[in-house]
């Protein structure tokens, strides 16, 4: 389960609409702009990213790492439990 501190980094990425690279539990990497948090149809908490002009929901439970794709004062790489 993601800690409150880790969740804060998700919210910061969305607030500033940072370009990010997500590494999923499957090993897949997704790149996009963090735009919001939401729940999917299964009610799982997700981060909404914009990739190739398409919004996509990624369940937070599937994320093992989030890397900022641009320099910022808040974070570079965050690893999730």
Feature locations, PLM:
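Conserved RNA-binding domains used in RNP assembly and mRNA/RNA metabolism
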Residues: 2-81
């Amino acid at each position: 389960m993601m800690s409150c501190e880790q969740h804060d980094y998700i919210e910061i990425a969305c607030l500033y609409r940072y370009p990010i690279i997500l590494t999923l539990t499957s090993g897949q990497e997704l790149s996009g702009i963090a735009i919001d948090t939401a729940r999917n149809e299964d009610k799982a908490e997700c981060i909404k990213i914009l990739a190739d002009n398409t919004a996509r929901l990624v369940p937070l439970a599937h994320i093992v790492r989030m890397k900022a794709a641009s320099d910022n004062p808040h974070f570079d790489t965050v690893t999730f439990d």
